[in-house]
């Protein structure tokens, strides 16, 4: 399927990605993004080839005169994976217009888009409005002395129920809930926490993950995985009534020390822009922003 759309000249087209062009596609994707967990072409290519045929068909190439100049992934009312070869930056608006046109033709009303903030001016010019953004932060690992007066131990998989209740309570009223993160039913939460142990967010690293205990009560937890080539802090939370006492810092430093012992030089995490307490903690430990912000934006339905 090829669609000319209502935007731009006939020389620029959106086409479903052909597997034979996957290498060129992901090379273009990497060239236009700085907010990614890795720039390793093979990792991205292997992840794509591991998708189901239906998932692969959601990837589209923006092609000009037969050359791939942009990438995007289209859902029924969603745009993601948006990237433009920097040498074709003037075509960004045309590619986006064609994507919106294609989704509108398919019946989409409101459209949600995910992209790096370098593309935000173009999205905003077409009516997309930022909902929230997240940024990737990284820090070098280092060994530190274990905290005094705080019991840390690796969580066990049979603690999923206890950890689930802990995370539900810790995230109640959190800034991210207004954006649809860290919400859901008890079953959804159990599935999410259990999925971290099972590898849904990368290989779970039990020896770099900890719970902080006061007696039998969990007052803090950090869960670390190995995702896209680097250790990732998948979750870090502290009980509401125990915040400001250094528990989050102790958990993070314990994990970083264990990773250093595993010869992992760096660790990454993602934080929502505006979550200043978390961001300030991470910066004080040595984390710095890497790449641009990953933005989630929304285009309301026509006539709204």
What are these regions (language model features)?
Residues 89-102, 238, 244-261, 280-284:
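Conserved acetyl-CoA-binding loop-helix of GNAT-fold acetyltransferases
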Residues 27-42, 166-182, 200-201:
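Helix-loop element at the rim of GNAT/NAT acetyltransferase active sites that forms part
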Residues 1-8, 76, 86-156, 296-297:
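Acyl-donor-binding surface of acyltransferase catalytic domains
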Residues 9-27, 151-177:
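A short beta-loop-alpha structural element at the N-terminal edge
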Residues 32-34, 39-103, 214, 222-231:
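Conserved donor-binding loop and adjoining core beta-sheet/short helix segment
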Residues 47-48, 74-77, 178-230, 236:
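A conserved beta-strand-loop-helix scaffold within acyl/acetyltransferase catalytic domains
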Residues 110-114, 233, 267-271:
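Conserved hydrophobic beta-strand within the GNAT/NAT acetyltransferase core sheet
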Residues 116-133, 249, 274-291, 299:
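Conserved active-site alpha-helix within GNAT-family acetyltransferase domains
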